[in-house]
């Protein structure tokens, strides 16, 4: 359950610092950091650490809880408890964790679950993960053929299924089978790496390609995206390039044939086999007859009747900006929505009504010409990959 009893004063907010130094921190995360009583963080670089301390001097580094004589699980338990102790003291605690704070991060989920079970307000704000960076740098859309993400050791230990027809992303390929912690792992300690290659070769064959990917931490770096065959990854000079922050991307086997549900297609009224457009379909061309026709029509396009532009002036815009970026303002709003709206100047009656109601349809509609609630379908920007037409 996301909602929790507000009877207890302490609260916990978990945010992500992203991958790239400082620049991946969201406005929402920065606002949470600035307004916290105390910030507990585990981040990947000194620049982000200094930025957090600049935004909130009452910040503590949890990285010191790691130890080379400790199991990582014990460290994660301690990290969670370090934050929970302060929540129980009635403090507004913010935990900042590298990447997305809920993706391959154990202490955040533990702390949130315990805080909620004890009646404290607790939530997680999203951040950018290594996988998000991988999708951007390698030009991959996971929806094109589906995508499965595994932690490398988990894949092996639990015999997770591999679907060669979909994208596969593997985390922590540089520490296969490792449960301990070291401040400086070397590639020759990744002694179980060949077990991972054996599993991949079983599913894809030795000549299938794998992209070794490392997202850049600083703006001075470029992403690392090196393509090797599974067989090449067994070579010592290649294996030595695999680090603790390495991620593998395994593309689908192009030889895998698509299986259509013809009964379902018939029920949808589709009489032909769906196609996948360029660039997801390597056999498609970027400028075929259909694409050329669509581009020709672009010159004479006019906004359709259902399109509603943003109002040129709206007092509601400034109010929503404050509510998004200032937690104390949001607290005032939640205490009494009607009183909050009545105390504002420059809003129309429709905008006040939308603010009190607070749902996305009414608010989105109040910002657009016409003031009427927005159809939920218009709020979803769906870029469909599979062509059914």
UniProtKB/Swiss-Prot annotation:
At what positions is N-methylthreonine found? 382
Q: Which keywords has UniProt assigned to this entry?
A: Methylation, Methyltransferase, S-adenosyl-L-methionine, Transferase
Residues reported to bind S-adenosyl-L-methionine: 98, 100, 103, 130, 172, 215, 246-247
The record's region (Clasp domain) falls at: 254-370
* Active site per database record: 72, 76, 98
Q: Does the keyword Signal apply?
A: no
What Gene Ontology terms for biological process does this UniProt record contain? methylation
Disulfide-bond pairs as recorded? none
Pathway(s) the chain acts in: Secondary metabolite biosynthesis
Q: How would you describe the post-translational modification of this protein?
A: CmiMA automethylates at Leu-379, Phe-381, Thr-382, Phe-383, Ile-384 and Ile-385 before being processed by a prolyloligopeptidase which likely forms a peptidyl ester upon removal of the follower propeptide, which then undergoes macrocyclization with the N-terminus of the modified core peptide. Peptide backbone alpha-N-methylations change the physicochemical properties of amide bonds to provide structural constraints and other favorable characteristics including biological membrane permeability to peptides.
A GO MF annotation of the entry reads: methyltransferase activity
Record-listed N-methylisoleucine modification sites: 384-385
List the residue ranges of the region (Methyltransferase domain).
1-253
InterPro entries given for it? Answer: 4pyrrol_Mease (IPR000878), 4pyrrol_Methylase_sf (IPR035996), 4pyrrole_Mease_sub1 (IPR014777)
Q: Which residues carry this modification: N-methylleucine?
A: 379
Q: Which residues carry this modification: N-methylphenylalanine?
A: 381, 383
- Residue span of region Precursor leader: 371-376
**Oligomer status and interactors:** Homodimer.
User: Per its database record, what is this protein's job?
Assistant: Fusion protein of the methyltransferase cmiM and a type I borosin core peptide; part of the gene cluster that mediates the biosynthesis of a type I borosin, a highly methylated cyclic peptide with potent biological activities. Type I borosins derive from the C-terminus of the fusion protein, and it is the same protein that methylates its own C-terminus using S-adenosyl methionine (SAM). The C-terminus is subsequently cleaved off and macrocyclized by a prolyloligopeptidase to give the final product.
- Entry text on domains: Within the homodimer, the clasp domain wraps around the adjacent subunit to position the core peptide into the other subunit's active site for iterative intermolecular methylation.
What protein family is recorded? In the N-terminal section; belongs to the precorrin methyltransferase family.
Q: What is this protein called?
A: Methyltransferase/ribosomally synthesized type I borosin cyclic peptide precursor cmiMA
What is the source species?
A: Coprinellus micaceus
* Primary gene name: cmiMA
